[in-house]
Amino acid sequence: MNHNVYLLTSFNLWSHGVYKISSISLSNSFFPHSFMFVKSLHLMTSQHIFKCLSSCNYALSILHNICLASFLYLSKCYYHTHILTSVRLDFCKSHAHTYIKSKAST
């Protein structure tokens, strides 16, 4: 089993102003024995996301990055679903975008 990140997503990006991720699966090398499956995760409102990340121009990449950071946090905190904190955003910007791009190209 590959313990890297899998994002199996069905996006409805503008559903009543809320980002909705319908289906996400994640397993990663930091937590090799944990596999999280969350059917629905609501990540605050789109306005709040773009307020936090106003310096970035790639909305879809940002959303993927937030997903990754959120799930890394979820792996530690089990099923606390209100994740998206500014503490995690630095991780997103510096690591997740490159990581997801490299996974997508393989």
Swiss-Prot record:
- The source's domain of life comes to Eukaryota
Q: What is this protein called?
A: Putative uncharacterized protein C1A6.11
